[in-house]
Amino acid sequence: MAEAGQPRPLTAFAPPPPLWKHFTPDNLKRLEEVKKEASKGEDGKPRKKKWTPAELRALQLPPELRFLVPPEIPMSGQYSVFGELQSLSTTLPSLQEQGIEQLYPSTPTETDPNKPSQPSRPFNHAYYLLKISKSLLLNFLEFVGILSITPEQFQSKVEDLRNLFINAHHLLNLYRPHQARESLIMMMEEQLNRSREEIQQMDKMHAEINGFLEQLKAQGIDVDSASKSGENDTAKRTTGDQDANNANSSRLVWDILDGTD
């Protein structure tokens, strides 16, 4: 058995932390029972509640169940990736802080962070990235020449190549905020253009609907006038029929009276 102080071997895929052994069905069931018990109201019935990690950490849990609760998010410190320590800080350290020679000029803020920034020419990342790329090609050709003539003197040229790659990678990381801003500007412009197209389509649809309503309105006026004229004709025809009927009735009455005489 390996000793506790013995470092773990580096592997392509790191092993899971030991606490995974506590994620058993029984422990998960017990945690749900504790959550139901803690969520009971005054009537003694459990209520549906969405637990936050902070609320779960505040519960009185046994040690084997505490591993099932998400821990607090670390805000500082370091973590290990394949045996290399990485910092949680999002601030990009300078090459000088890492003890690496910087092959491109520093910006005013990198030279003196406490000095108030003044308007200056923007740093051209692409220009220096291109120069470093050309230097990489030249140094690689020199490296191949050294290997073909004096292979034992390769170490210095390997260091030069390593330094060039690190500088190029650092320049790319410095360029990421600018790239993020440009990507955000492009995304907002696309949203603005899409909103303008939607507004134009809505205006077009509004005009079509107004034209259709005007057409219906005009057709409705014609129908109303036609129906009114039809009603007048019907009324006149009905009045004439009634007059004829009245006349016939009167004539019959006079005929009857004449017959009785």
From Swiss-Prot:
Subcellular location(s) per record: Nucleus
Chief site of localization: nucleus
Biased composition (Basic and acidic residues): 23-45, 230-240
Disulfide bonds: none
Free-text function comment from the UniProt entry: Component of the Mediator complex, a coactivator involved in the regulated transcription of nearly all RNA polymerase II-dependent genes. Mediator functions as a bridge to convey information from gene-specific regulatory proteins to the basal RNA polymerase II transcription machinery. Mediator is recruited to promoters by direct interactions with regulatory proteins and serves as a scaffold for the assembly of a functional preinitiation complex with RNA polymerase II and the general transcription factors.
SUBUNIT field: Component of the Mediator complex.
Protein name per its UniProtKB record: Mediator of RNA polymerase II transcription subunit 7
Species of the source: Neosartorya fischeri (strain ATCC 1020 / DSM 3700 / CBS 544.65 / FGSC A1164 / JCM 1740 / NRRL 181 / WB 181) (Aspergillus fischerianus)
